[in-house]
Amino acid sequence: HEPALDYSFIPKIVPYREKEQRIIAGCIKPLFDSKSGKNAFVYGQPGVGKTVALNKVLQELEEETDEIIPIYINCWQRNTTYQIIAEICEKMGLKFIQNKRTEELFRWIKQDLSKKSAVFVFDEVDKLQELDFLYMILEEIGRKSVILITNYKEWILELEDRIKSRL
């Protein structure tokens, strides 16, 4: 079946990932009560279903509410703070972002999220060239869940303490 071969295809059911999806849903659940969610670190071998399971949770979240914005970023494709902040703006529907500085774009994101919540999923985090955006989100966005996906569980050990302590 052709759609199943499409990289962005999300099946109706993600077999053998129900437990992981329940854990992630538990991290997001406080956002429904206008509280900050929990953060998560997801790791495992390539091809075991991490990305598709998380995207399924985001898809269900998008169908359920407009008050929580699901944001998925592939850090292999966007690996600098500016690229990631600009991509978040695009996913949030913020316009006229060209030729704007990172700080200005981030201010827009904060302003837009002052009345809503967000789930940030950063996939392939081990491909990042810089982590300033992560500190900014962890420190300055109120109601959020941050989910980091990688193939390497050791990656988290390399994080700066100022970021690790906020996860």
Predicted regions and their residues:
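Conserved helix-loop functional segments at active or binding sites
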Residues: 30, 63, 94
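A short, basic N-terminal segment
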Residues: 1-36
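Phosphate/oxyanion-binding active-site loops and adjacent basic polyanion-contact surfaces
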Residues: 16-20, 49-50, 80-81
